[in-house]
Amino acid sequence: MMSKVFFDITIGSDTAGRIVMELFDEVTPKTAENFRALCTGEKGVGKAGKPLHFKGSHFHRVITDFMAQGGDFTRGNGTGGESIYGEKFADENFQLKHDRPGLLSMANAGPNTNGSQFFLTFVPCPWLDGKHVVFGEVVEGLEILEQLEANGSQSGQTKQAIVISDCGEIK
């Protein structure tokens, strides 16, 4: 059974809707568990003194024809974030490829620097294979992903604030 998690997304002052993702627990158990727990907030407060929880955090970088990046709940600008295992953890494996839209993959700052930042692909991104760990995919709400992309830009700056207003696990 794959874990299923959700994000309720707000764009500006409007409720955009829900994105449901399945996590590839069998291929990337450690990475999937980190993301699942950050969706529920069940691990409490991290070393940075902030809750280990995506709720209320932003998609700080959205590049059209590429991806939407979020998960920096400590600084909100792409320089922060924290995993449930401590600040950073190793790349689990590169078994899965960035071969389609709607994939969930870990953002990083180089090898073995996974924290809480992630991205959702808008297109196949083969140049990321072997550098970023794919650990899940969108199973409902691809149209919400399109709304995220419509609020992005080539620079990554968003036109309006894109917020994870709620998130959790679907049992």
Swiss-Prot record:
EC number of this enzyme: 5.2.1.8
GO biological process: protein folding
Catalytic activity: [protein]-peptidylproline (omega=180) = [protein]-peptidylproline (omega=0)
Domain PPIase cyclophilin-type: 6-169
Cystine bridges: none
Record-level Gene Ontology MF annotations: cyclosporin A binding; peptidyl-prolyl cis-trans isomerase activity
Pfam families for this protein: Pro_isomerase
Domain of life, per lineage: Bacteria
Any one cellular-component term (Gene Ontology): cytoplasm
Keywords annotated in UniProt: Isomerase, Rotamase
PANTHER family: PEPTIDYL-PROLYL CIS-TRANS ISOMERASE (PTHR11071), PEPTIDYL-PROLYL CIS-TRANS ISOMERASE D-RELATED (PTHR11071:SF561)
Role played: PPIases accelerate the folding of proteins. It catalyzes the cis-trans isomerization of proline imidic peptide bonds in oligopeptides.
Family affiliation: Belongs to the cyclophilin-type PPIase family.
Name of this protein: Peptidyl-prolyl cis-trans isomerase slr1251
Organism this protein belongs to: Synechocystis sp. (strain ATCC 27184 / PCC 6803 / Kazusa)
